[in-house]
């Protein structure tokens, strides 16, 4: 008697690749669907952390999620077919490290910085990215160690460059070529969990820049850029005031030996003398809002008032029976009312009137228009100065502008101080931060409506991609409050200046400099010799630098996702990697779903919304549910053309020795 071996390949060994591996092991342990299984894991970076979360990156770079709300493992809240298998969250793992004896610390192999961070990390602290990478690497080892006895894992520290059916067009066994010359043949399933992939290098913003000796750095992860050649005192312009900006800010200051000290009203910066002279700006002219201090514990979240399961079912049913929805007409009014209700309810509670909250919400939601809702506000004693204003929240600067740089600087420092005060009050207690946290809490509900073409293509392009996604990021996924404090201290120390709203950048050929100005801040424009695009590159399959995705697109084995649009026959081509609904099979140029290829995560942005969000315990994490769906589909496959092996007798689950995890070199 002989049996077949199932051979699987996961391309990408970051958090999503790890989640698929963990879920696949869980399915196989519960019920060994195949007598023998090999899982190849392909990534040039160390498995678990991958490139983005690598452990060697500077310790100045922080996550923007608290430690207790980060995990690799499933729980009872996750809607999935597979078994729940417990494992530590990031904070729970930190507690494990903190409890180690000195001998255990030596045996564990973790460096002093990791152990020190573990001892200091609280449930609501923001970990360094390097520490998260250490967690991911350790969880990868645990998953492999806990794998069922019939499953082996082989790690290939290389880059996948091409994928093909061994028999063209058959949908059978797959062959994957790696950059080191290795060819993985006879693959029964391939899962693409590529994460953030590099984009093609764009040219300089103006052909004059290179000729004038100006340095322009395109959008990228700051940890991937070598900026060591920028000399102290060099004027540097950062275009963007989001999370990427704060990374650059930290690397140019803390990363160059500067330090902050606490004083009664904020921080003071102590320069090292190695900093460049920093200038920054953006369209809004203010940084992302600070995250409110977490008061929701591990899994607390806003319970939807309007975006209920019944309303979501009604909206998705309308889409399936007809054209895509309009975001502005159908979803935005619901989101806006949810946020406003939480703001006003928290405002009443902060005034000692919590008992009136339910009555207010009922009356406010019953209001048919702005006039009706205004009457409700008057009845509950909420005056004009305390009323929620979306325009002011999205663009907080004065409409009339400023008298000059000094006036703008004073206004900005007060804006930053107010943001810190609100953040310190918490994401439940402070009316503004509680309201903005609703946007984060509603992401799953919004995804259920907009994913897989739920919106009309033009509404997806103009309203979701072109407006709401940016607004959502600005208001709800900002940095810790400590970063806003640091920014203010750098402004006060003369290390950083913010140009102002409506940033405009040009080149002065006579002066060989980038020139930046704000139309709302009169005065002498800023001049810089270095321009850094302080943002990540846009996810776009058509402009990716990833060799595997480029090859799949060139050969017609994948395609860019296109959303039908009522007023545009050609629809909206998004640049996202097209996949089916769960379990996310890859779709080729002719619209055919491949039975043995799966993809999820960042490259599928636009098919799915906000794909960069991580897995959180206790809230039915979409990421964990997606990983389980893919793992279940892979485990259900029949081997295509794997070599035959002797019949296998399962000795039961055991903890495999180190030789079960094999690192393969060419």
Curated annotation (Swiss-Prot):
GO terms for molecular function: monooxygenase activity. InterPro entries: FAD/NAD-bd_sf, HpyO/CreE_NAD-binding, L-asp_N-monooxygenase_NS-form. Keywords: Antibiotic biosynthesis, Monooxygenase, NADP, Oxidoreductase. Its cofactor is FAD. It is an enzyme of class 1 (oxidoreductase). Residues 656-666 have a biased composition (Basic and acidic residues). Pathway: Antibiotic biosynthesis. Its EC number is 1.14.13.248. It catalyses: L-aspartate + 3 NADPH + 3 O2 + 2 H(+) = 2-nitrobutanedioate + 3 NADP(+) + 4 H2O. Pfam families: NAD_binding_9. It comes from the Bacteria. Residues 645-666 are annotated as: Disordered. GO terms for biological process: antibiotic biosynthetic process. PANTHER family: BLR0577 PROTEIN (PTHR40254:SF1). Belongs to the nitrosuccinic acid synthase family. Part of a gene cluster involved in the biosynthesis of cremeomycin, a light-sensitive o-diazoquinone with antibacterial and antiproliferative effects. Catalyzes the iterative oxidation of L-aspartic acid to nitrosuccinic acid (2-nitrobutanedioate) via N-hydroxyaspartic acid and nitrososuccinic acid. This is L-aspartate N-monooxygenase (nitrosuccinate-forming). The gene is creE.
């Amino acid at each position: 008697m002989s049996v077949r071996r199932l051979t699987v390949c996961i391309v990408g060994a970051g958090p999503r690749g790890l989640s698929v591996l963990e879920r696949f092991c869980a399915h196989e342990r519960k019920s060994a669907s195949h007598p023998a299984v090999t899982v190849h894991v392909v990534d040039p970076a160390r498995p678990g952390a991958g490139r983005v979360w690598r452990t060697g990156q500077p310790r100045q770079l922080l996550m923007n999620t608290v430690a207790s709300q980060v995990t690799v493992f499933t729980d009872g809240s996750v809607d999935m077919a597979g078994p729940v298998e417990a494992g530590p969250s990031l904070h729970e793992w930190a507690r494990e490290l903190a409890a180690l004896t000195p001998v255990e610390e030596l045996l564990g192999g973790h460096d002093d910085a990791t152990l020190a961070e573990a001892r200091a990390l609280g449930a609501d602290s923001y970990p360094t990215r390097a520490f998260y990478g250490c967690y991911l690497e350790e969880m990868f080892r645990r998953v492999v160690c806990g794998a069922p006895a019939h499953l082996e894992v082989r790690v290939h520290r290389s880059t996948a460059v091409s994928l093909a059916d061994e028999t063209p067009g058959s949908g059978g066994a797959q062959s994957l070529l790696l950059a080191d010359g290795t060819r993985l043949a006879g693959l029964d399933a391939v899962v693409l969990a590529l994460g953030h992939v590099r984009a093609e290098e764009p040219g300089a913003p103006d052909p004059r820049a290179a000729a004038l000796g100006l340095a322009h750095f395109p959008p990228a992860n700051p940890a991937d850029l070598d900026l060591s050649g920028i000399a102290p005192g060099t004027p540097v312009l950062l275009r963007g005031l989001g999370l990427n900006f704060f990374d650059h800010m930290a690397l140019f200051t803390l990363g160059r030996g500067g330090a902050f000290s606490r004083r009664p009203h904020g921080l003071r910066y102590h320069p090292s003398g190695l900093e460049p002279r920093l200038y920054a700006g953006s369209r809004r002219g203010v940084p992302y809002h600070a995250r409110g201090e977490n008061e929701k514990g591990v899994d607390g979240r806003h319970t939807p008032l309007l975006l209920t399961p019944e309303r979501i079912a009604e909206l998705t049913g309308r889409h399936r029976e007809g054209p895509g929805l309009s975001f502005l007409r159908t979803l935005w009014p619901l989101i806006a009312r949810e946020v406003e209700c939480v703001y006003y309810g928290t405002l009443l509670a902060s005034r000692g009137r919590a008992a009136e909250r339910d009555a207010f919400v009922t009356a406010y939601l019953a209001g048919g228009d702005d006039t009706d809702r205004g009457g409700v506000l008057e009845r509950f004693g909420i005056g004009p100065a305390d009323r929620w204003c979306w325009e002011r929240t999205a663009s907080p600067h004065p409409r009339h502008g400023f008298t000059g740089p000094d006036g703008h600087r004073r206004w900005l420092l007060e804006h930053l101080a107010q943001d810190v005060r609100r953040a310190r009050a918490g994401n439940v207690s402070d009316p503004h931060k509680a309201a903005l946290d609703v946007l984060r809490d509603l992401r799953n509900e919004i995804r259920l409506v907009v994913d897989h073409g739920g919106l009309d293509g033009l509404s997806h392009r103009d309203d979701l991609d072109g407006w709401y996604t940016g607004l959502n990021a600005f208001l709800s996924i900002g940095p810790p409050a400590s970063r806003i404090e640091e920014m203010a201290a750098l402004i006060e120390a003369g290390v950083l200046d913010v140009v102002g709203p409506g940033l405009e950048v040009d080149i002065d050929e006579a002066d060989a400099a980038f020139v930046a100005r704000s139309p709302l801040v009169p005065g002498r424009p800023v001049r810089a010799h270095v321009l850094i695009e302080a943002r990540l590159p846009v996810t776009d399959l058509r402009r990716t630098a990833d060799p595997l995705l480029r090859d799949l697109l060139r050969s017609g084995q994948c395609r860019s996702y296109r959303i039908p649009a009522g007023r545009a026959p050609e629809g909206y081509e998004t640049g996202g990697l097209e996949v089916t609904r769960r379990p996310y099979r890859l779709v080729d140029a002719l619209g055919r779903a491949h039975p043995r290829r799966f993809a999820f995560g960042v490259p599928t942005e636009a098919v799915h919304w906000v794909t960069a969000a991580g897995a959180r315990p206790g809230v039915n994490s979409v990421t964990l549910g997606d990983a389980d769906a893919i793992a279940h589909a892979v485990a259900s496959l029949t081997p295509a053309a794997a070599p035959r092996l002797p019949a296998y007798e399962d000795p039961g689950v055991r903890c495999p020795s180190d030789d079960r995890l094999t690192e393969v070199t060419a």
